[in-house]
């Protein structure tokens, strides 16, 4: 049970949808990673990638931060191709059929991870872009929404007393305090809302991450790769954000 997830769902933030689809994105990618590229036909390899692309589109349509996780998917996908090719080369096997299959997979992924996610993302704005005063300039309105959102977040100058640097987050050193009521009720009680992770889960998870990175250092392990890449892809980009 994670306290932060409980709080975020109760105050109805969109982060919960992004996290949900991020989990589905990586679940679908794991299904692909379990396939043997050397023997599995293309029709068996494509369904998990299609599902992964759909979930990616839904995640990014929910919140841009899901795009960070999509970078991790790319690392896992191309890593799978590269290590399979290297393994076959070490065995001295003919690589031409495998290269052809990898090329076809990459072409299909242009549809699954570019066209389809963009279509889903674009469709998410249709309730706004198809309003009577927007419908005649639908594309311009769509682009304007993107630039407005980007400019707002990139130029926002805001501080929060309970903000904390990114390197403190895994240890739950300074939980964020969202709200406190001005006056107490008849029983002398105040209302307050705070978001913090379950210290047991977060600290143990951080130790598990270290173990996963250590396994990767000593040799590729698929579960370790998924855990490490998945976490770092959504965590490290925040090191570049000055406003936390």
Identify what each model region corresponds to.
Residues 4-17, 62-65:
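Short acidic/glycine- and proline-prone juxtamembrane loop motifs at membrane-interface regions
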Residues 19, 65-87:
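Transmembrane-embedded, aromatic-rich helix segments that form part
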Residues 25-48, 78-88:
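Membrane-interface transmembrane helices that cradle and orient dolichyl/undecaprenyl
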Residues 41-63, 235:
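Membrane-interface alpha helices of multi-pass inner-membrane proteins
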Residues 42-43, 85-108, 208-229:
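Membrane-interface helix-loop-helix junctions at transmembrane boundaries of multi-pass membrane enzymes
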Residues 60, 215, 232-244:
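Transmembrane-helix signature of polytopic, lipid-linked glycan biosynthesis machinery
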Residues 98-101, 108, 117-172:
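Aromatic-rich transmembrane-lumenal/periplasmic boundary elements in polytopic membrane proteins
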Residues 182-186, 191-221:
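Hydrophobic, aromatic-rich transmembrane alpha-helices
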């Amino acid at each position: 049970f994670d306290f932060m997830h409980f709080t975020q769902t109760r105050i109805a933030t969109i982060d919960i949808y992004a996290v949900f689809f991020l989990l589905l994105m990586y679940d679908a990618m794991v299904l692909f990673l379990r396939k043997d590229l050397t023997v599995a036909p293309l029709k068996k390899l494509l369904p998990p990638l299609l599902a992964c692309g759909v979930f990616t589109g839904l995640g990014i349509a929910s919140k841009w931060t899901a795009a960070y996780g999509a970078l991790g998917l790319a690392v896992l996908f191309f890593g799978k191709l590269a290590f399979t090719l290297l393994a076959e080369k070490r065995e001295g096997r003919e690589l031409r059929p495998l290269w052809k299959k990898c090329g076809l997979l990459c072409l299909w992924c242009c549809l699954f991870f570019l066209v389809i996610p963009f279509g889903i993302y674009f469709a998410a704005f249709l309730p706004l872009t198809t309003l009577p005063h927007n419908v005649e300039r639908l594309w311009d309105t769509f682009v304007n929404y993107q630039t407005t959102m980007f400019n707002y977040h990139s130029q926002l100058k805001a501080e929060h007393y309970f903000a904390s640097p990114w390197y403190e987050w895994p240890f739950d050193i300074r939980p964020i305090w969202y709200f406190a009521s001005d006056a107490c009720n008849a029983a002398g009680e105040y209302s307050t809302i705070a978001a913090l992770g379950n210290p047991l889960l977060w600290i143990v998870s951080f130790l598990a991450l270290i173990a996963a990175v250590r396994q990767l250092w000593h040799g590729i392990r698929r579960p370790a790769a998924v855990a490490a890449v998945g976490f770092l892809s959504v965590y490290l980009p925040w090191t570049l954000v000055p406003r936390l």
